C-alpha cells in the first residue's frame, strides 16, 4: 500500500534566474517511478485560494506528483479508499519551491495558497476525466477547515469546489 509523502525537488538559481528539472522518469525513488501521462499547471493569483479536495474514480483514478513552481501552499491529502486502513486519515504538508508531494491513487488532494501568484505543476498517471472527477467540500474535513479558519474568513473557491459534497455524505455511499 502506498502513502502520501513529501520529497525534495530542488530549484537551482543564479544571476540568470532559476532552473528546476522535472524528470518524467524518476528512477531515483521507486515510489515516484510512475507512467506519468499528463502535466498540468495551476496558477492562483490570490493568497488563500483553495483548490479541492479533488480525486477521480476508477478506472481514471490518479496518482499525483505536485511541485510548487513559485509561492507556497499547505497541501491536504485524505484517504478516500474504503479498503485502505488509512481510510479517512488526513495528511498536511507545507510545500514550497524546493519540495514536492506524492499523492497515491485513492487519496483526495486539496490545497490553500499561502502567497499570491502561486504556481503549481503536477504530474498525473491517468488523464483528466470530468465524468470521473469528484470534489469534496474542504470545510467538511475538520483539519482543513480548522487550518483555513486560522488564516482567513474569506478564502477564494471555485463554484465547483464550493458545491462539493460533504465527507460525511461520501462515507454513507460506501
Each model region followed by its residue ranges:
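Non-catalytic, conserved peripheral segments adjacent to functional cores
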Residues: 1-94, 117, 126-174
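Conserved metal-binding segment of the jelly-roll/cupin
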Residues: 94-117
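Compact nucleic-acid interaction/catalytic patches
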Residues: 120
